[in-house]
Curated annotation (Swiss-Prot):
SMART domains on file: FMN_bind
GO biological process: electron transport chain
Family to which this protein belongs: Belongs to the RnfG family.
Residue positions, PTM FMN phosphoryl threonine: 174
Major localisation: membrane
EC number of this enzyme: 7.-.-.-
Protein name: Ion-translocating oxidoreductase complex subunit G
Keyword rRNA-binding set for record: no
Length: 206
């Protein structure tokens, strides 16, 4: 009887140990898969705002944290694109604080000479059917920033047409596109200041 109990106890202990090990292995595999998927999604988003042929470094690993009013309140990530180890452009997180329904989060690609290479909205709460046309899945409006040059803080072209600029507003919704245009302009201007301050910026994760 005692031998049987001991035998069953050992079997249960081995089973428990095996189950724990299997669970840990599955959890680790799941974490790895999630991390890989997140990395692929991030790269796909980068490719939408910065042409891949313009750089040859690992963009996600060239990440810096900046606190700059031009990008919005708090810290924002900036990714420096390099060609043969020479900084050539940046992908910047930026916030348009003055959307119709609150802050609009953006990703802006820009070189250091004042040209915006691409823009995408990553988060917003704008009105469906009106301000949400800033989303690529609903309209190509957001793609019209690519290739646009900023000639300085007073560049009148960088405004919606209602304000005398070059960018369309939406029917029944001017506040949202105005907020995005202004935020992209600020980010593009800020990008020009990055080369001079790279050595002082903290890396992401520090």
């Amino acid at each position: 009887m005692l031998k049987t109990i001991r035998k069953h106890g050992i079997t249960l202990a081995l089973f428990a140990a095996g189950s724990t090990g299997l669970t840990a292995a599955i959890n680790q595999m799941t974490k790895t898969t999630i991390a890989e998927q997140a990395s692929l999604q991030q790269k796909a988003l980068f490719d939408q705002v910065l042409p891949a042929e313009r750089y040859n470094n690992a963009l996600a690993q060239s990440c810096y944290l900046v606190t700059a009013p031009e990008l919005g309140k708090g810290e924002h990530r900036v990714y420096i694109a390099k060609q043969d180890d020479k900084p050539v452009a940046a992908v910047l997180e930026a916030t348009a604080p003055d959307g119709y329904s609150g802050a609009i989060q953006l990703l802006v690609g820009a070189d250091f000479n004042g040209t915006v290479l691409g823009t995408r909205v990553t988060e917003h709460h704008e009105t469906p059917g009106l301000g949400d046309k800033i989303e690529l899945r609903l309209s190509d409006w957001i793609t019209h920033f690519a290739g646009k040059k900023i000639s300085g803080a007073d560049d009148a072209h960088w405004a919606v047409k209602k304000d005398g600029g070059d960018f369309d507003q939406f029917t029944g919704a001017t506040i949202t596109p105005r907020a995005v245009v202004n935020a992209v302009k600020r980010a593009g201007l800020y990008a020009q200041t990055l080369p001079a301050q790279l050595s002082q910026l903290p890396a992401c994760g520090e």
